[in-house]
Amino acid sequence: MASRPDTDDYLNLFLNDVPLMDVRAPVEFAKGSFPSAENAPLMNDEERHRVGICYKEKGQDKAIELGHQLVSGDIKAQRIEAWKRFVAQHPEGYLFCFRGGLRSRLTQQWIRDSGIDYPLVKGGYKALRRFLIDSLEAQIESGQFRILSGRTGTGKTRVLMQLPNPVDLEGLANHRGSSFGRQVTPQPSQIDFENRLGVAMLKARHQAGGPIYLEDESRLIGRCALPETLRARMSESPLLILEQAMEERIAIIRADYVEGMLASYRARDGEDAGWLNFRDYLLSAIDRIRKRLGGERYQKLRNLMLQALDQQEANGSLEGHHGWIEALLTDYYDPMYDYQLTQKQGEILVRGGPEVITEWARSRTST
C-alpha cells in the first residue's frame, strides 16, 4: 500500500464521509464520535482506567509502561488484527485518538510493524470536534434558513426531503419530535447529535448551496437539544406552511405511528413480543402528556386508544385508531400549534399542500 501523509484536512474528511478508525476506549466512543467512525480501541475501558490512575499517581513514563504490559501478547495481537481488518476494508481511511498523540502514534507504529502504513488525523478527536462546532456556529450565524412548518400529521418530513437543500433534524436525532416520536432504535448521544448536525450542515453548504430547509422543531427532539443559536435563527427565519385536510393527516399519522411502528417493533422483536412492545409504545406516549391533556381528556383518549388496539388485535382492523388520532389532533396538537405560530417572527412565504410547497421551493433554488 502506498504511504499517505497524516491529515488535517477536516473538511474533506467530513464532506466525503472518509472512514475513520477511532482508537479511543469504548466509553469515550459511546459519549460521542463521528458518523463515519468505527471504534477499534487500543485499550478497553478497564485498561484505560488503570493507565489513567497510573498517570496521575506516577507520571507519563510509568503509565506508558503499564499500558504496554496490559496490551501485550494475545491481546495486542487481537487489537492489531482488528486494525488490519479495518485498513483492508477502508484503505482510504485514517485513524485518530483523543488529541492525535500517543495512542494514535502507537497504533500507527504497531500497524506499521505489520507492514502497513496508515495515516492519522492530526489533532485527533478534539481537533475534529472543534472544527465541526466552529463551522456549525459560523454557518448558523451567516447561513440562510427556511423553515417548513405545519400542524401535526401534515407529513412535514416527507415534504422536507423533496425540497432543494434539506437538513433532516429528526432523522439526525432519530426521533420524530413529539411524545409519540421515539423510534425502536435508540437516539444518539447529545455529542453524536451535534456532530451529525455539523456534518449535515457542512454538506448542505458546500455540496448543495442555497437556502437550507429545516423542519420546524422545538428545543428538544426527544432528548437531543438543538443549539440555542440555531433555535434563535429558526424562530426568525421565513416560513413555508404545509397544509393538509384532516382525513389526510389522520392517514399519515396512522401510517407512521401505527402501521410503521408496529412493523418496526415486529421486525426487531418478533410477532408476539413486537405487538406487546408496540402497544406499550402507544400507551406510554399518551401517558407522557397526561398532565397537559388534563384528567378527563386523557382518560377519554386512552380509552379510545385501548379500544382501537383491542380491535386491531382481534381482527387486524385499523379503523378504530381514527377516533383517538382525530381527537388528539383537534383537542390538543392543533390548538398548541396555532398558538406557537402566532409567536413566530419569520415572514410566511407560502401556504399550501405538498405540491404547492415543493414547486415553490424548486422554482426559487437560485434566490
From Swiss-Prot:
- Start and end of every Rhodanese domain? 14-137
What does the record give as the active site? C97 (s-selanylcysteine intermediate)
Alphabetically, which GO biological process terms does the record hold?
tRNA wobble uridine modification
Signal sequence extent: none
Q: What class of enzyme is it?
A: transferase
Which positions, given as ranges, span the membrane? none
Q: Which gene encodes it?
A: selU
SMART domains, per the entry: RHOD
Q: What is the lineage of its organism?
A: Bacteria, Pseudomonadati, Pseudomonadota, Gammaproteobacteria, Pseudomonadales
Q: Which CDD domains match?
A: RHOD_YbbB
Give the GO molecular function terms. transferase activity, transferring alkyl or aryl (other than methyl) groups; tRNA 2-selenouridine synthase activity
InterPro entries assigned: Rhodanese-like_dom, Rhodanese-like_dom_sf, SelU
Q: Which UniProt keywords apply?
A: Selenium, Transferase
Q: What is its EC number?
A: 2.9.1.3
Could you describe the subunit structure of this protein? Answer: Monomer.
Cysteine disulfide partners in this protein: none
Note the PANTHER family from the entry: TRNA 2-SELENOURIDINE SYNTHASE (PTHR30401:SF0)
**Catalyzes what?**
5-methylaminomethyl-2-thiouridine(34) in tRNA + selenophosphate + (2E)-geranyl diphosphate + H2O + H(+) = 5-methylaminomethyl-2-selenouridine(34) in tRNA + (2E)-thiogeraniol + phosphate + diphosphate; 5-methylaminomethyl-2-thiouridine(34) in tRNA + (2E)-geranyl diphosphate = 5-methylaminomethyl-S-(2E)-geranyl-thiouridine(34) in tRNA + diphosphate; 5-methylaminomethyl-S-(2E)-geranyl-thiouridine(34) in tRNA + selenophosphate + H(+) = 5-methylaminomethyl-2-(Se-phospho)selenouridine(34) in tRNA + (2E)-thiogeraniol; 5-methylaminomethyl-2-(Se-phospho)selenouridine(34) in tRNA + H2O = 5-methylaminomethyl-2-selenouridine(34) in tRNA + phosphate
> What family does this chain come from, according to its entry?
Belongs to the SelU family.
* Protein name, UniProt field: tRNA 2-selenouridine synthase
**Described purpose of this protein according to its UniProt entry:** Involved in the post-transcriptional modification of the uridine at the wobble position (U34) of tRNA(Lys), tRNA(Glu) and tRNA(Gln). Catalyzes the conversion of 2-thiouridine (S2U-RNA) to 2-selenouridine (Se2U-RNA). Acts in a two-step process involving geranylation of 2-thiouridine (S2U) to S-geranyl-2-thiouridine (geS2U) and subsequent selenation of the latter derivative to 2-selenouridine (Se2U) in the tRNA chain.
